[in-house]
Regions:
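Chalcogenol-based redox active-site neighborhoods
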Residues: 1-161
Length: 161
């Protein structure tokens, strides 16, 4: 169940409402972003489960989980991988947060994270590693594009109130 909600044309800016969506989680449940109003949300987009950079990014967040909980933050990771693959990834690395499947990349498009990439001279569409910190009212408080997995957790903590 991938419902990106109203289309925003890929325009997202700090201070504006975060595009709402409903995606399927690693446990098979439908998760809607707006259901977390009242708490800050760390919404991070990543290319693929169980790859070096994505694993470092996820484990970095896991390693500061206690601090994120103290700040009352909800963490949602989003990639094009399916719920089963997410469940295996989450279990393998003991990730305490929810992973969401955006298999048709509609939500990534609404957040402008589904972008043109290139590798070895080939051009293709793929997920840009990006994070959005959404405040308790549902507005985008901070946008981090092309994040570095090694520094990501510290940057997320610094962006939270």
């Amino acid at each position: 169940m991938n419902d990106p909600g109203p289309r925003t044309g890929g325009v997202v800016e700090e201070g504006r409402p975060a595009p709402d969506f409903t995606l399927t989680s690693d446990s098979g449940e439908a998760v809607t972003l707006s259901s977390f109003r009242g708490a800050p949300v760390v919404l991070y987009f990543y290319p693929r489960d169980d790859t070096p950079g994505c694993t470092a990014q996820a484990c970095g967040i896991r390693d500061v989980w206690g601090e994120l909980e103290r700040k009352g933050a909800v963490v949602l990771g989003v990639s094009p991988d399916g719920p089963r693959k997410h469940a295996k990834f989450r279990e393998k690395y003991g990730l305490p947060f929810t992973l969401l499947s955006d298999e048709d990349h509609a939500v990534a498009e609404s957040y402008a994270t589904w972008v043109q990439k290139s590798m070895y001279g080939k051009s293709y569409m793929g997920m840009e590693r990006s994070t959005f910190v959404i405040d308790a009212e549902g507005n985008i408080a901070s946008i981090m594009r092309k994040v570095k997995p090694a520094d990501h957790a510290d940057d997320v903590l610094a962006a939270l109130p």
